[in-house]
Amino acid sequence: MFEYFDIFNKERGTAASNEMFKFFDRGNNTLVLRPDMTPAIARCVAKYFREETEQMRFCYTAQTFVSTGQYKGKLQEVTQVGAELFMDDSSDADAEMLALTIECLLESGLKEFQIEVGHADLFRAL
């Protein structure tokens, strides 16, 4: 639930700094309530599966937290559901994850939805 703020810096983070609920620990490190699960999953893979050379797929459901409303300090708890595919940077892997997303949305009963892809390298590959 708690993460170091540095994990979510501009280069790697998915939440804006002003949307994170921040505080300090006893060592004066800046901590945040987790705004996104992806870095935590990536850290676990790097630590526990560093010897793996084959594709690895993970899925999760977890609570994430963002501060809504400028300067209001209101905390919003959001259930994040995600899937990650590691050890494959091919366009086929990207297509697999997009297909999984679409299948899950359809299975949930949604008939109309929009998917936004925010990774510039994916569009360069197209």
Regions found by a protein language model. Give the residues of each.
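TRNA-recognition modules of translation machinery and tRNA-sensing kinases, especially anticodon-binding
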Residues: M1-L126
